[in-house]
């Protein structure tokens, strides 16, 4: 099973005898399995450490240390992180990933995690990779300054991108739904390659060069 890693696909294998291969694809359709547009953005924030980062900021800024009574809070944040990452991996795969990612099982008065073949850290890293290719996109294309909004979004509306893909690329709904954000960006750049304008980095470079020349002229005029 070959994964197209350039567009975000991942292939993982169960190395045990009789084990199978799994293909994970962070498509627009897979993103909708995660939840509502708001939940998709919340999931992205969670798997990139937003909850833990907030706890650390509070402790370091207000308390100046990490008190013992906060350990349960870190444990809950870690459990939420793992559970969310498991959700992302399963959303991106058509097969049941329980043998690989494990599962949460009720036991007496608590819920415990029964591990699969993959280490927890690998589950987290792969979930981050999938969300980056599924929501943000990692295509190496020029981002023009005029297209930058600088605004944070609270929603990721996958269906809007599916509709855009159908309109721009003449795809049917099923084909468009299987695109990842990275693939969508690459197709868009290929169809509209001659957009004029500057990226943020290009604009800043030109501005810095202009200001440097201006300063040199003024310094020379004062001599």
Q: What is each of the regions a protein language model found here?
A:
Residues 1-62, 76, 84-92, 99-198:
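An amphipathic, hydrophobic-aromatic interaction surface with interspersed Lys/Arg
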Residues 201-223:
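Long, intrinsically disordered, low-complexity Ser/Thr/Pro-rich regulatory/activation regions
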Residues 64-80:
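Intrinsically disordered, low-complexity acidic Ser/Thr-rich regulatory segments
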